[in-house]
Amino acid sequence: MSPSADTPEISNSADSTVLSLKKSLCSEDSPLPIRFRALFSLKHVATTADDDATRVAAIEAIAAGFASPSALLKHELAYCLGQTGNTAAVKPLRQVLSDLKEDPMCRHEAAEALGALGWADNLDILREYRDRKEEDISIVETCEIAIERIEWENSAERQKEKLRPSDFASIDPAPPMPESDKEAEVEDLGRKLMDTNADLFSRYRAMFALRDLASPPDLPTATPAVLALAKGLSDSSALFRHEIAFVFGQLSHPASIPALTEALSNTNEASMVRHEAAEALGSLGEKDGVEDTLRKFLHDKEKVVRESCIVALDIAEYEKGEDAEYALIPESAGAAA
Protein backbone atom coordinates (compact mmCIF):
# COMPACT_ATOMS: atom_id res chain seq x y z
CA MET A 1 0.00 0.00 0.00
CA SER A 2 1.72 3.16 -1.17
CA PRO A 3 1.35 6.19 1.08
CA SER A 4 -1.40 8.51 -0.10
CA ALA A 5 -0.81 12.18 -0.68
CA ASP A 6 -2.02 13.05 2.80
CA THR A 7 -0.02 10.33 4.57
CA PRO A 8 2.63 11.85 6.86
CA GLU A 9 6.12 11.50 5.46
CA ILE A 10 8.55 9.28 7.27
CA SER A 11 10.33 11.21 10.01
CA ASN A 12 14.09 11.71 9.89
CA SER A 13 14.60 9.62 13.04
CA ALA A 14 12.40 6.80 11.74
CA ASP A 15 14.12 6.95 8.36
CA SER A 16 17.52 6.70 10.04
CA THR A 17 16.38 3.71 12.12
CA VAL A 18 14.97 1.84 9.13
CA LEU A 19 18.04 2.51 7.00
CA SER A 20 20.38 1.36 9.76
CA LEU A 21 18.39 -1.85 10.30
CA LYS A 22 18.20 -2.46 6.56
CA LYS A 23 21.97 -2.16 6.32
CA SER A 24 22.42 -4.76 9.08
CA LEU A 25 19.84 -7.07 7.53
CA CYS A 26 21.22 -6.96 4.00
CA SER A 27 24.94 -7.08 4.78
CA GLU A 28 26.41 -10.48 3.96
CA ASP A 29 29.30 -9.50 6.23
CA SER A 30 27.02 -9.24 9.27
CA PRO A 31 26.77 -12.34 11.48
CA LEU A 32 23.51 -14.18 10.92
CA PRO A 33 22.22 -13.55 14.47
CA ILE A 34 22.64 -9.80 13.96
CA ARG A 35 20.71 -10.02 10.69
CA PHE A 36 17.90 -11.89 12.42
CA ARG A 37 17.76 -9.32 15.19
CA ALA A 38 17.60 -6.55 12.58
CA LEU A 39 14.79 -8.40 10.81
CA PHE A 40 12.63 -8.67 13.91
CA SER A 41 13.33 -5.03 14.68
CA LEU A 42 12.08 -4.10 11.20
CA LYS A 43 9.01 -6.28 11.77
CA HIS A 44 8.40 -4.32 14.97
CA VAL A 45 8.57 -1.04 13.03
CA ALA A 46 6.38 -2.41 10.23
CA THR A 47 3.62 -3.33 12.66
CA THR A 48 3.79 -0.54 15.26
CA ALA A 49 4.99 2.67 13.57
CA ASP A 50 2.55 5.56 13.88
CA ASP A 51 2.51 6.42 10.18
CA ASP A 52 2.00 4.36 7.05
CA ALA A 53 5.10 5.72 5.35
CA THR A 54 7.38 4.34 8.06
CA ARG A 55 5.58 0.98 8.05
CA VAL A 56 5.95 0.69 4.29
CA ALA A 57 9.62 1.70 4.47
CA ALA A 58 10.22 -1.09 6.99
CA ILE A 59 8.41 -3.60 4.77
CA GLU A 60 10.50 -2.55 1.77
CA ALA A 61 13.65 -2.93 3.89
CA ILE A 62 12.60 -6.47 4.84
CA ALA A 63 11.89 -7.32 1.20
CA ALA A 64 15.36 -6.08 0.21
CA GLY A 65 16.76 -9.03 2.13
CA PHE A 66 15.47 -11.48 -0.50
CA ALA A 67 18.70 -10.82 -2.41
CA SER A 68 20.53 -12.92 0.20
CA PRO A 69 21.69 -16.45 -0.66
CA SER A 70 20.56 -17.68 2.78
CA ALA A 71 17.36 -19.71 2.46
CA LEU A 72 16.94 -19.59 6.23
CA LEU A 73 16.98 -15.80 6.29
CA LYS A 74 14.73 -15.48 3.25
CA HIS A 75 12.11 -17.83 4.65
CA GLU A 76 12.09 -15.75 7.85
CA LEU A 77 11.68 -12.57 5.77
CA ALA A 78 8.58 -14.06 4.17
CA TYR A 79 7.17 -15.06 7.55
CA CYS A 80 7.64 -11.54 8.92
CA LEU A 81 6.01 -9.95 5.87
CA GLY A 82 2.97 -12.16 6.41
CA GLN A 83 2.64 -10.88 9.97
CA THR A 84 2.47 -7.21 8.96
CA GLY A 85 -1.15 -7.10 7.76
CA ASN A 86 -0.06 -4.57 5.15
CA THR A 87 -0.76 -4.69 1.42
CA ALA A 88 2.77 -3.46 0.75
CA ALA A 89 3.92 -6.99 1.63
CA VAL A 90 1.92 -8.62 -1.16
CA LYS A 91 4.11 -7.84 -4.17
CA PRO A 92 7.41 -9.22 -2.81
CA LEU A 93 5.64 -12.33 -1.48
CA ARG A 94 4.02 -13.04 -4.84
CA GLN A 95 7.40 -12.58 -6.52
CA VAL A 96 9.06 -15.11 -4.20
CA LEU A 97 6.28 -17.68 -4.67
CA SER A 98 6.47 -17.24 -8.46
CA ASP A 99 10.25 -17.66 -8.62
CA LEU A 100 10.75 -21.32 -9.53
CA LYS A 101 14.50 -20.95 -8.95
CA GLU A 102 13.93 -19.96 -5.33
CA ASP A 103 14.39 -22.49 -2.54
CA PRO A 104 11.11 -24.38 -1.91
CA MET A 105 11.32 -23.52 1.78
CA CYS A 106 11.21 -19.81 0.90
CA ARG A 107 8.41 -20.27 -1.63
CA HIS A 108 6.37 -22.25 0.88
CA GLU A 109 6.80 -19.50 3.46
CA ALA A 110 5.72 -16.87 0.92
CA ALA A 111 2.55 -18.85 0.20
CA GLU A 112 1.85 -19.21 3.90
CA ALA A 113 2.41 -15.48 4.38
CA LEU A 114 -0.10 -14.65 1.64
CA GLY A 115 -2.58 -16.82 3.51
CA ALA A 116 -1.81 -14.99 6.75
CA LEU A 117 -2.53 -11.65 5.08
CA GLY A 118 -5.99 -13.02 4.37
CA TRP A 119 -6.95 -11.18 1.19
CA ALA A 120 -9.01 -12.91 -1.47
CA ASP A 121 -7.04 -11.09 -4.20
CA ASN A 122 -4.25 -13.61 -3.60
CA LEU A 123 -6.37 -16.70 -4.18
CA ASP A 124 -5.43 -16.69 -7.87
CA ILE A 125 -1.71 -17.21 -7.37
CA LEU A 126 -2.25 -19.69 -4.54
CA ARG A 127 -4.53 -21.79 -6.73
CA GLU A 128 -2.04 -21.55 -9.59
CA TYR A 129 0.79 -23.10 -7.57
CA ARG A 130 -1.45 -25.56 -5.74
CA ASP A 131 -2.44 -26.97 -9.13
CA ARG A 132 0.94 -26.65 -10.88
CA LYS A 133 2.23 -29.96 -12.24
CA GLU A 134 5.41 -31.26 -10.62
CA GLU A 135 5.24 -28.61 -7.90
CA ASP A 136 7.06 -29.33 -4.64
CA ILE A 137 4.62 -31.06 -2.29
CA SER A 138 5.34 -28.65 0.58
CA ILE A 139 4.26 -25.75 -1.65
CA VAL A 140 1.15 -27.57 -2.87
CA GLU A 141 0.12 -28.31 0.72
CA THR A 142 0.91 -24.77 1.88
CA CYS A 143 -1.15 -23.23 -0.91
CA GLU A 144 -4.02 -25.58 -0.07
CA ILE A 145 -3.99 -24.48 3.58
CA ALA A 146 -3.57 -20.79 2.67
CA ILE A 147 -6.56 -20.95 0.32
CA GLU A 148 -8.72 -22.48 3.01
CA ARG A 149 -7.55 -19.90 5.53
CA ILE A 150 -8.46 -16.99 3.23
CA GLU A 151 -11.83 -18.54 2.43
CA TRP A 152 -12.46 -19.06 6.14
CA GLU A 153 -11.36 -15.49 6.96
CA ASN A 154 -13.88 -14.08 4.50
CA SER A 155 -16.75 -16.48 5.27
CA ALA A 156 -20.02 -16.06 7.13
CA GLU A 157 -19.01 -19.10 9.18
CA ARG A 158 -16.05 -17.14 10.55
CA GLN A 159 -18.42 -14.57 12.03
CA LYS A 160 -20.37 -17.26 13.88
CA GLU A 161 -17.41 -19.08 15.39
CA LYS A 162 -16.35 -18.43 18.96
CA LEU A 163 -12.59 -18.80 19.23
CA ARG A 164 -10.81 -19.36 22.52
CA PRO A 165 -8.66 -16.33 23.48
CA SER A 166 -5.02 -17.12 22.70
CA ASP A 167 -1.84 -16.15 24.49
CA PHE A 168 -0.17 -15.84 21.08
CA ALA A 169 -0.21 -12.72 18.93
CA SER A 170 0.97 -14.46 15.76
CA ILE A 171 -1.20 -14.73 12.66
CA ASP A 172 -1.30 -18.49 12.23
CA PRO A 173 -1.72 -20.62 9.07
CA ALA A 174 -5.06 -21.78 10.47
CA PRO A 175 -7.25 -20.65 13.37
CA PRO A 176 -7.76 -22.98 16.32
CA MET A 177 -10.91 -25.05 16.34
CA PRO A 178 -13.84 -23.04 17.70
CA GLU A 179 -15.01 -23.39 21.25
CA SER A 180 -18.09 -25.50 21.82
CA ASP A 181 -20.47 -25.80 24.75
CA LYS A 182 -18.25 -28.63 25.96
CA GLU A 183 -14.66 -27.66 25.25
CA ALA A 184 -12.81 -30.32 23.30
CA GLU A 185 -10.55 -32.42 25.45
CA VAL A 186 -6.89 -32.91 24.62
CA GLU A 187 -7.51 -36.54 23.69
CA ASP A 188 -10.21 -35.57 21.18
CA LEU A 189 -8.06 -32.85 19.63
CA GLY A 190 -5.16 -35.30 19.46
CA ARG A 191 -7.29 -37.69 17.42
CA LYS A 192 -8.27 -34.87 15.06
CA LEU A 193 -4.63 -33.81 14.77
CA MET A 194 -3.62 -37.27 13.60
CA ASP A 195 -6.65 -37.99 11.39
CA THR A 196 -5.02 -38.44 8.00
CA ASN A 197 -8.44 -38.71 6.35
CA ALA A 198 -9.15 -35.08 7.26
CA ASP A 199 -7.83 -32.15 5.23
CA LEU A 200 -4.69 -30.39 6.42
CA PHE A 201 -6.54 -27.19 7.30
CA SER A 202 -8.75 -29.07 9.79
CA ARG A 203 -5.73 -30.84 11.25
CA TYR A 204 -3.92 -27.51 11.60
CA ARG A 205 -6.95 -26.17 13.47
CA ALA A 206 -6.61 -29.03 15.93
CA MET A 207 -2.88 -28.29 16.18
CA PHE A 208 -3.40 -24.66 17.16
CA ALA A 209 -6.20 -25.56 19.56
CA LEU A 210 -3.78 -27.92 21.31
CA ARG A 211 -1.15 -25.18 21.35
CA ASP A 212 -3.56 -22.87 23.15
CA LEU A 213 -4.35 -25.60 25.69
CA ALA A 214 -0.61 -25.83 26.41
CA SER A 215 -0.21 -22.18 27.42
CA PRO A 216 0.48 -21.04 30.04
CA PRO A 217 2.64 -24.04 30.95
CA ASP A 218 1.07 -24.49 34.39
CA LEU A 219 -2.34 -25.33 32.90
CA PRO A 220 -3.39 -28.90 33.76
CA THR A 221 -3.83 -29.49 30.02
CA ALA A 222 -0.37 -28.16 29.08
CA THR A 223 1.83 -31.25 29.27
CA PRO A 224 -0.82 -33.61 27.83
CA ALA A 225 -1.32 -31.15 24.94
CA VAL A 226 2.43 -31.00 24.26
CA LEU A 227 2.66 -34.79 24.24
CA ALA A 228 -0.32 -34.98 21.88
CA LEU A 229 1.38 -32.49 19.56
CA ALA A 230 4.62 -34.48 19.66
CA LYS A 231 2.86 -37.37 17.96
CA GLY A 232 2.52 -35.10 14.92
CA LEU A 233 6.27 -35.35 14.35
CA SER A 234 5.65 -38.86 13.00
CA ASP A 235 3.23 -37.65 10.30
CA SER A 236 4.01 -38.37 6.65
CA SER A 237 3.86 -34.67 5.69
CA ALA A 238 7.11 -32.75 6.22
CA LEU A 239 5.10 -29.53 6.16
CA PHE A 240 2.92 -30.79 9.00
CA ARG A 241 5.95 -31.94 11.00
CA HIS A 242 7.68 -28.60 10.56
CA GLU A 243 4.59 -26.76 11.82
CA ILE A 244 4.54 -28.93 14.94
CA ALA A 245 8.15 -27.89 15.59
CA PHE A 246 7.23 -24.23 15.03
CA VAL A 247 4.41 -24.50 17.58
CA PHE A 248 6.85 -26.04 20.06
CA GLY A 249 9.07 -23.00 19.54
CA GLN A 250 6.16 -20.76 20.47
CA LEU A 251 5.33 -22.78 23.57
CA SER A 252 8.89 -23.23 24.92
CA HIS A 253 7.59 -26.10 27.02
CA PRO A 254 10.26 -28.45 28.41
CA ALA A 255 8.10 -31.50 27.68
CA SER A 256 8.80 -30.91 23.98
CA ILE A 257 12.59 -31.20 24.31
CA PRO A 258 12.87 -34.98 23.72
CA ALA A 259 10.75 -34.85 20.55
CA LEU A 260 12.57 -31.79 19.21
CA THR A 261 15.97 -33.32 19.95
CA GLU A 262 14.99 -36.49 18.13
CA ALA A 263 13.79 -34.51 15.09
CA LEU A 264 16.97 -32.43 14.90
CA SER A 265 19.19 -35.47 15.41
CA ASN A 266 17.57 -37.47 12.62
CA THR A 267 19.77 -36.71 9.62
CA ASN A 268 17.23 -38.45 7.37
CA GLU A 269 14.54 -35.95 8.40
CA ALA A 270 13.61 -33.14 5.98
CA SER A 271 15.78 -30.07 6.49
CA MET A 272 12.70 -27.84 6.87
CA VAL A 273 11.72 -29.92 9.91
CA ARG A 274 15.21 -30.15 11.42
CA HIS A 275 15.80 -26.42 11.08
CA GLU A 276 12.49 -25.64 12.79
CA ALA A 277 13.32 -28.09 15.57
CA ALA A 278 16.67 -26.36 16.09
CA GLU A 279 15.08 -22.94 16.41
CA ALA A 280 12.44 -24.31 18.77
CA LEU A 281 15.20 -25.73 20.96
CA GLY A 282 16.77 -22.28 20.98
CA SER A 283 13.68 -20.98 22.78
CA LEU A 284 14.43 -23.58 25.49
CA GLY A 285 18.10 -22.73 25.68
CA GLU A 286 18.10 -22.21 29.43
CA LYS A 287 17.28 -25.89 29.97
CA ASP A 288 20.12 -28.32 30.72
CA GLY A 289 21.67 -29.96 27.67
CA VAL A 290 19.87 -27.92 25.01
CA GLU A 291 22.84 -25.78 24.02
CA ASP A 292 25.07 -28.86 23.87
CA THR A 293 22.57 -30.48 21.50
CA LEU A 294 22.54 -27.43 19.24
CA ARG A 295 26.34 -27.22 19.16
CA LYS A 296 26.49 -30.79 17.84
CA PHE A 297 24.90 -29.64 14.59
CA LEU A 298 26.86 -26.44 13.95
CA HIS A 299 28.71 -28.35 11.22
CA ASP A 300 25.76 -30.30 9.83
CA LYS A 301 25.82 -31.16 6.13
CA GLU A 302 22.65 -29.10 5.59
CA LYS A 303 23.34 -25.36 5.47
CA VAL A 304 19.87 -24.44 6.72
CA VAL A 305 20.38 -26.67 9.77
CA ARG A 306 23.82 -25.20 10.48
CA GLU A 307 22.48 -21.66 10.23
CA SER A 308 19.44 -22.49 12.36
CA CYS A 309 21.70 -23.77 15.12
CA ILE A 310 23.71 -20.54 15.00
CA VAL A 311 20.53 -18.49 15.33
CA ALA A 312 19.11 -20.85 17.96
CA LEU A 313 22.19 -20.49 20.15
CA ASP A 314 21.81 -16.71 19.91
CA ILE A 315 18.16 -17.04 20.94
CA ALA A 316 19.29 -19.26 23.81
CA GLU A 317 21.60 -16.51 25.06
CA TYR A 318 18.63 -14.15 25.04
CA GLU A 319 16.38 -16.69 26.81
CA LYS A 320 19.00 -17.06 29.56
CA GLY A 321 18.67 -13.33 30.19
CA GLU A 322 22.08 -12.26 28.96
CA ASP A 323 20.51 -9.72 26.60
CA ALA A 324 17.78 -7.25 27.53
CA GLU A 325 15.99 -7.55 24.17
CA TYR A 326 16.25 -10.05 21.33
CA ALA A 327 15.56 -7.43 18.68
CA LEU A 328 17.89 -4.49 18.15
CA ILE A 329 14.97 -2.30 19.21
CA PRO A 330 12.17 -3.49 21.53
CA GLU A 331 10.09 -6.21 19.88
CA SER A 332 6.87 -7.61 21.31
CA ALA A 333 7.11 -11.30 22.10
CA GLY A 334 5.34 -13.93 20.06
CA ALA A 335 3.23 -14.77 23.10
CA ALA A 336 1.22 -11.90 24.50
CA ALA A 337 2.06 -10.95 28.05
From Swiss-Prot:
Its EC number(s): 1.14.99.29
Repeat (HEAT-like PBS-type) residue spans along the chain: 73-99, 106-132, 202-235, 240-266, 273-300
The keyword Oxidoreductase is assigned to this record: yes
Comment on bound cofactor: Binds 2 Fe(2+) ions per subunit.
UniProt keyword annotations, A-Z: Cytoplasm, Hypusine biosynthesis, Iron, Metal-binding, Monooxygenase, Nucleus, Oxidoreductase, Repeat
Compartments it resides in: Cytoplasm; Nucleus
Recorded GO CC terms: cytoplasm; nucleus
InterPro entries in UniProt: ARM-like, ARM-type_fold, Deoxyhypusine_hydroxylase, HEAT_type_2, PBS_lyase_HEAT
Catalytic function, reaction form: [eIF5A protein]-deoxyhypusine + AH2 + O2 = [eIF5A protein]-hypusine + A + H2O
UniProt similarity note: Belongs to the deoxyhypusine hydroxylase family.
Entry protein name: Deoxyhypusine hydroxylase
Gene label: LIA1
